[in-house]
């Protein structure tokens, strides 16, 4: 669990691991943290993470409502979009959407011009210009996977943010499709 996902600081997180499970060391050295990650603990960040985890700052129910509002909005204005993943397995703050007939890189630039942050994939694949291996594993074609964007919602996201994103998406997708044809 990354602290920043619940309103805590960047660079700190938690790993829950059964004692019987062995994983290779991330950092070698003094043997702290069951020899998985050696080094001095960042006590202030740990305390801030704990405070964030206990606070009402990150409310999964509210964030799920924003996500669901976004899904309802984009499927209303763009009925051809595909919402990826099973509804029952969705995380509160993440939606991955396929926009048929577009290229995700083009959509990303057009959304950025509207001051809307989204991504062509997970944070760990940022800067990689390949189809999402997750979408490919889910059975999507290469073309479909390269027509997808990931939208994330967090504690600072608002209904106004959702409404604005939904309002600009039809024009962004139209322009993205036109660029894809040229």
Predicted feature locations:
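Pyridoxal 5′-phosphate
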Residues: 1-182
């Amino acid at each position: 669990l990354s602290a920043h996902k619940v309103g805590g600081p960047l660079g700190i997180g938690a790993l829950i691991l059964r004692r019987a499970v062995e994983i290779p060391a991330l950092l070698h050295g003094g043997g702290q943290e069951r020899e998985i990650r050696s080094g001095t603990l960042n006590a202030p960040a740990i305390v801030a993470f704990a405070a964030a985890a206990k606070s009402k700052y990150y409310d999964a129910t509210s964030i799920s409502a924003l996500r669901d509002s976004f899904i309802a909005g984009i499927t209303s204005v763009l009925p051809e979009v595909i919402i990826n993943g099973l509804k029952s397995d969705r995380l509160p703050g993440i939606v991955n959407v396929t926009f048929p007939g577009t290229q995700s890189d083009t959509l990303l630039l057009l959304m950025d011009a509207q001051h809307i942050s989204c991504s062509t994939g997970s944070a760990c694949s940022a800067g990689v210009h390949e189809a999402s291996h997750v979408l490919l594993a889910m059975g999507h074609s290469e073309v479909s996977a390269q027509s997808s964007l990931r939208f994330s919602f967090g504690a600072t996201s608002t209904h106004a943010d959702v409404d604005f994103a939904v309002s600009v998406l039809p024009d962004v997708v139209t322009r993205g499709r036109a660029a894809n044809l040229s």
